[in-house]
Amino acid sequence: MFGIADYGAFVVAVIVFLAIPGPGNLALLGATGQGGIRSGMAATLGVIAGDQTLLWLAVSGISALLATYPAAFQTIQWVGAIYLVWLGAKLLRTRLDDAPALELKPDHFFKQAFFITVLNPKAIVFYMAFFPLFVNPAEHQGLITFAVMAATIAALTLAYGLVIVVSAHMLRSEEH
C-alpha cells in the first residue's frame, strides 16, 4: 500500500512504540496534571510536531548523515539527556506546598513536548533505523509513501494522546 511493505505491521509497530513508557508519555501526563485537557492536548500536538520533524529529517537524509557521523548522533543524545535531567531537576526543586500556582499556557506544554520528542534518543533511533524497514523499494512512490507514513503516525499519536490525556484527567478528577 503506497510503497509501505506491510501497512498493518507498520501500524502495530507504531502503536507499540507509542505505548512504551518514555519522556513523551510523561510530558503528556505532566501537562494534563498541571493544566488539564487543553494543556495535555497541546503537549500531544508538540509530540506530533516533534515526530513529524524527525520523520521528515530522516526522509531528507539527515539520518544517513547522523549514521555516517556517530559523534553528531551522540551529541544529540547528550543534549537530550541534559534537557531531560534539567526538566527533572526543575521539577524536584519545586515543592508543591510552597510553589505558587503557575498559570502556564498550553503553548508552554506544546514547546516542552516538542523539544522532549526531538531530543529523545528513542525517537531518533526509531526514525533512523526502524522506520526504513517498512519502505518497500520496489513499490516506493516517493513522497507519497512518506506522507502516508507521516499521516498514519500523526493520527495514531493524536488518538493515543487523546486517550492518555482524557484518562489522566478523569483519574485526577476522581481524586479531588
Predicted regions and their residues:
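Juxtamembrane transmembrane-helix termini in multi-pass membrane transport proteins
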Residues: 2-74, 129-153, 165-168
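Short alpha-helical functional segments enriched in proximate histidine and acidic residues
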Residues: 52, 56, 117, 158
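Selective transmembrane alpha-helices of multi-pass membrane proteins
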Residues: 68-96, 154-164, 168, 172-175
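Flexible cytoplasmic inter-helical loops of multi-pass small-molecule transporters
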Residues: 93-109
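A short amphipathic helical element positioned immediately N-terminal to and/or at the very start
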Residues: 110-118
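Selected transmembrane alpha-helices and immediately adjacent juxtamembrane segments
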Residues: 121-122
